[in-house]
């Protein structure tokens, strides 16, 4: 179109629109990410440097060493993150960390710097920290005590730290192998030359799993040869005559000339320099979970030379590409930052495990094997089967395929599908048989390039193995014979176990049917209806059952808040679990007395503050109203309030543990306007999208259209107030009225879906708090 043929005003308007569109598309999406979101309020995320699904993450470690500067200390309470925004005492940068988890692990191999005379006690060389900055792939901080600027960036398997000594003079680089978040101890390190060290540290005992241990190997290269260097080791405390033999007993002993390897629980390596003012010393670190040699290979391959700026640019570019899969328009600045930070958190775990040569530690045995596809680790499946994997299947289906292939490899290597796998070890944390749900959900979405015969074999093992030999379903015999799991011990989580088995068996029924296994499908479908055993007419809730078949008495439905011990339920109470029958919501409603009683009882969960936004069992509750069209306005109101109240552009902006992306995935789906309240069903509950327009770039290997556009269009232009309701949406030329659920094919093949938004829902006008 030629602008000369347009009226002047129209031409100028078009120019402005074109300019705005260009400006928005050219803006870096990494600048919309705030890595400090979730670093307080027990969100347990961290602001360190990492690339999408990278093995390496490097983050500030500030949870030990100073009662004065730290509000929280990892050794004084339950603590599961190497960093919190509430603390201000910096001990160093830890290499390989977990994001959003509830148990401590990894967060070790801590590199730092100091100025002045050498002191290897981290409570002494640690420093107050200030001027923190972070965005995807980069973090920096000022070490106030030493006048050092510390910066970090990362590749998939390596990191590089830059320490700039502003004053110059006596300067030190310190590698602490004793301090860390892990509950395991013991490390070994040796010099390869004056500027390169290699070694390993023992990790594990995650979430009460004492046998789930593994080694993290490392290779560290310093940019400048040190005039003086050596080891340190904390000596045991001695008494009496014995103490006279060692002047360093009970203290850190310095080894300035010894160059063979050294081992111990509290050891480290130091490098001392005389620096010029403003001089920068770089520390390049490679890691592996196979060997020291592979850690060094990863380092020399991914950082063949020293170029901090190039590594940073590559990290930023990788994030920009990953984030640009979803492009949003409109919304507030805070809403955009919340959304893209959630997408950033989604892409941290699971992370790759294989080294550059394809080697990785096999499941259970930790023997070395080689993979042809990306091998993933950190499968927090009780959390992530609900929304993380469905979202990955939509946005990053090739990643999701490799994750399923990894799960099947784990079955071949260890004999079982994973439940909560961590660096090649099964921790058996939480309950259920979640791999079944992930695999079926992936297949139902059309991602089918994996061995379905092997998958079905693996699924059946957990669903049919009797007795104590069943590692995934330890109470299988009761479940199979009774249709439920009785409460045999005071706090044995029996109801939680059974509810997870029901949704797993429903998914297995769906997969069996797709594989042509009709009898199996019928068996598992019958099992999935066993939730009805727990329904108590007296309270209208699910209630634990004793071995004699009677309900637990006395019964306190609200017991279990704030993780207090609770008979029958894990990390929650009866209210948090009683609507968790995602595969049969209409059946549950009938059991509860019909639509009206179901809706009233579900609404009371929110009215009486029995909804827990910080944990998974009731995370889909807001979307259950969409099964009843006249009540769907409640979903729109509640999700709007929850997003506004619990998801904020600040460190406390996640309602609790991010659970390796599960809370972030809830926010992403909710802001997009649809949610998979029953994984495996290919059905979504709808809510009002947050943004004016969202463009999702789909992978055409798996999806018909290259994009899915979601837009909102107000029906009442006269007001600027937030419109949180809709009762119509349009796909193509078809207008849907009073429809609040949509299936996956309809949505993914829509090309464009338009929500017509308004101020008023199914009740008199309600404003958001």
Residues covered by each model-derived region:
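Accessory carbohydrate-recognition regions in carbohydrate-active enzymes
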Residues: 24-389, 393-437, 443-499, 507-533, ...
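Beta-strand signatures of extracellular beta-sandwich domains
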Residues: 728-730
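Flexible, glycine/threonine-enriched loop-and-boundary segments that flank and lead into catalytic domains
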Residues: 677, 702-709
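Bacterial Sec-dependent N-terminal signal peptides
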Residues: 1-25
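ATP-dependent phospho-/nucleotidyl transfer catalytic cores
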Residues: 504
